[in-house]
């Protein structure tokens, strides 16, 4: 049995202020090691090989950009590279705390340097550059070499503020406050922080969805799981000196604004319509979250650096009204779009599904008609058919998943029965999950739109529609999250729990497989018609995670494909799509934006010369303004040619193209039937 005994106590710091592990941490670490050994899906031995991975993860999590440690520090840490497996098994956390305490000294030294030089008068006429991404660089061999890295860091930050319109005194004020706050945050580090970073360096060696949460962070995790927070509905994560948005809650203010995307970085926060914008670069993510949260109905303004943009690039400001994230906000919604082409008129129904949810309380009270994604979509289909739509599109973009049972039952609205998904657990046992719905709710033309942030339950639904050839799947390759997690409180594994609270462990226990036997893990769902994408598989999604569980295949479940889609139809749709990619201005603009973002992401070095940076900034603005004018004039021309303007009024190029493809699909289907 996985049960441990022991009293939980201990001090966080010794008399010199050095951080030390508590007895609770020693107990927790032994429990975590045993849970991963007994229950995790991946059969991985805690050995020298994994020890090296944990070592690299820990160093990277502390100083991934190589701004603090010296090369001599790393050499001194190497003695632990192949020892962490043994120390973890014994509940020994000395190596982690030794490394972290050295890190604290180096960090404090760098912050002292930054504060001493934040008022320097930099020469912006020099032709020198700054490498902001130092992941591939070596560690500095001396303090003088690290000083030069930080001189350029400060110069780049000052230049960015100058280019945004800040006066010299304001630049100094912002930088000074930034690093004073950073130093204040560092002083708040405690042994729980060290332990959480170290345990997640261990869990990340198993897979990216296995995580440890301290008791404090466990409370936040549970609140987010219940969607009970009053705020903007965004999940935040530390990303070096920045706080990154990693998830948007369906129906939350951030999601509904359509101005914020995953991977955006929060660099400033202001309260109310006229509150001062506070610089939050260098803040801890929990402090950023605390600043964003507030009473329902109040306004918060965020200054964001778009995901993929280089430091110093143009930022955007978004105003949001805080609200409580309620179940109703995750409900599917529908609209009817009129589209005309070549003398043919099409009435298209669009159903947006932001989340797969089920209201358990309502289910207990109303077992025949409870609130759920499936029941909502079923009602929307009935309403759309009452409006005589020619086809229906299911929009699953940015739908990160939810209740598995809802993905299965919603598939049943379009499929006549059979297996929807297979699940394989850590013991190798496979369970098939079938659609139990009697009959189908919709038999007409169907397409499903996905993107890189469609994950988990979304991938199950899209994969089933594609495998059964029930509809056409369009958009981008999905995230590739095909695993199942369990969440357990570590206190559950103690024979005699003490009074002190322990954290939570979320760990992977199973994998999803499509009816064909192909896993959705790692590869996700590849659409039948693939759109140009901002997000590359190498940088975003499951395939970008080094420890992600691999794709594999099991035996296919018995199933009979339908005849709604065939290769001839897909060839026609692909041809029409390719033609529009070359002619449609919105799609041309989209491809231009993608190319520019790709160029920005590949850029690891920026100029520290004012004139050159100003020219680059002005060139980007000129191109952006020119495209806005072209787009406005084209919209006016199109409005004169087409009687129904509803499609032309749409700003969403992906949605417009999906509607056009569904119209092509409807036309191709008519020709097939003769």
PLM region spans:
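Cleft-lining beta-strand/loop regions that shape enzyme active-site pockets
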Residues: 11-13, 20-21, 37-47, 184-191, ...
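Extended, small/polar residue-biased N-terminal targeting/export presequences
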Residues: 46-52, 59-132, 183-238, 299-301, ...
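Extracytoplasmic/secreted envelope proteins and their assembly/folding machinery
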Residues: 26-33, 47-59, 74, 81, ...
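PDZ/PDZ-like domain segments forming the peptide/carboxylate-binding groove
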Residues: 44, 60-61, 82, 96, ...
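Bacterial N-terminal signal peptides
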Residues: 1-7
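Conserved functional hotspot residues or short segments at active or partner-binding sites
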Residues: 117, 166-177, 514-674
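Polar, glycine-rich mid-to-C-terminal structural blocks
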Residues: 457, 469, 474-540
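Acidic/histidine-rich, surface-exposed loop or edge segments in extracytoplasmic proteins
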Residues: 12-17, 29-41, 79-83, 177-181, ...
């Amino acid at each position: 049995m996985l049960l441990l005994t022991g009293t939980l106590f201990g001090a966080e710091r010794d008399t010199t202020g050095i951080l030390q592990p508590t007895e609770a941490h020693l107990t927790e670490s032994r429990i975590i090691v045993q849970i991963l050994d007994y229950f995790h899906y991946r059969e991985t031995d805690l050995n020298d090989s994994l020890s090296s991975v944990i070592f690299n993860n820990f160093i990277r999590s502390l100083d991934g950009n190589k701004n603090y440690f010296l090369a001599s520090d790393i050499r001194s840490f190497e003695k632990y590279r192949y020892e962490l497996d043994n120390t973890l098994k014994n509940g020994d956390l000395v190596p982690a705390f030794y490394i972290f305490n050295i890190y604290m000294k180096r960090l404090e030294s760098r912050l002292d340097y930054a504060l001493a030089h934040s008022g320097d008068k930099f020469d912006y006429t020099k032709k020198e550059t700054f490498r902001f991404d130092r992941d591939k660089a070596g560690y500095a061999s001396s303090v003088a070499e690290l000083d030069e890295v930080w001189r350029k860091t400060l110069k780049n930050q000052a230049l960015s503020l100058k280019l945004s319109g800040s006066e010299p005194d304001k630049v100094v004020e912002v930088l000074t406050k930034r690093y004073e706050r950073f130093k204040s945050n560092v002083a708040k580090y405690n042994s729980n922080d060290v332990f959480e970073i170290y345990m997640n360096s261990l869990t990340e060696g198993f897979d990216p969805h296995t995580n440890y949460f301290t008791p404090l962070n466990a409370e936040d995790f549970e609140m987010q799981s219940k969607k009970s927070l009053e705020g903007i509905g965004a999940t935040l994560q530390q990303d070096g000196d920045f706080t990154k948005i990693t998830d948007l809650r369906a129906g939350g203010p951030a999601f509904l604004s359509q101005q914020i995307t995953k991977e955006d970085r929060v660099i400033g926060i202001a309260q109310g319509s006229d509150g001062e914008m506070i610089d939050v670069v260098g803040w801890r993510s929990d402090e950023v979250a605390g600043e964003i949260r507030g009473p329902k109905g109040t306004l918060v303004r965020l200054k964001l650096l778009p995901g993929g943009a280089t430091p110093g690039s143009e930022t955007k400001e978004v105003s949001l009204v805080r609200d409580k994230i309620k179940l109703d906000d995750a409900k599917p919604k529908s609209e009817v779009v009129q589209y005309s082409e070549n003398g043919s008129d099409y009435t298209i129904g669009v159903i947006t599904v932001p989340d797969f949810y089920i209201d358990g309380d309502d289910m207990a009270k109303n077992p025949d008609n409870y609130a759920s994604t499936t029941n909502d979509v079923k009602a929307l289909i009935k309403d759309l058919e009452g409006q005589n739509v020619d086809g229906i599109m299911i929009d699953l973009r940015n739908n990160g998943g939810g209740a598995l049972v809802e993905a299965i039952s919603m598939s049943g609205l379009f499929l006549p029965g059979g297996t929807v998904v297979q699940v394989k657990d850590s013991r190798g046992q496979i369970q098939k999950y079938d659609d139990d719905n009697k009959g189908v709710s919709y038999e007409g033309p169907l397409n499903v739109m996905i993107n890189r942030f469609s994950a988990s339950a979304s991938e199950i639904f899209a994969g089933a529609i594609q495998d059964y050839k029930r509809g056409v799947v369009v958009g981008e390759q999905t995230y590739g999250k095909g695993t199942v997690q369990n969440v357990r409180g570590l206190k559950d594994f103690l024979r005699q729990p003490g009074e002190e609270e322990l954290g939570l462990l979320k760990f992977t226990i199973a994998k999803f497989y499509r009816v064909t036997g192909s896993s959705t893990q790692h590869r996700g769902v590849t659409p039948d018609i693939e759109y140009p994408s901002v997000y590359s598989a190498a940088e975003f999604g499951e395939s970008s995670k080094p420890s992600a569980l691999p794709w594999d295949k099991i035996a296919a479940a018995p199933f009979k494909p339908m005849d709604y889609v065939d290769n001839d139809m897909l060839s026609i749709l692909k041809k029409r799509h390719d033609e529009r990619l070359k002619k449609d201005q919105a799609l041309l603009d989209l491809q231009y934006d993608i190319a520019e973002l790709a160029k920005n992401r590949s850029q690891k070095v920026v100029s520290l010369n004012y004139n050159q940076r100003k020219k680059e900034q002005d060139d980007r603005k000129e191109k952006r303004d020119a495209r806005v004018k072209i787009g406005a004039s084209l919209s006016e021309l199109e409005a004169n040619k087409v009687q129904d303007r509803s499609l032309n009024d749409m700003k969403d190029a992906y949605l417009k193209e999906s509607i056009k493809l569904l119209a092509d699909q409807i036309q191709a289907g008519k020709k097939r039937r003769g």
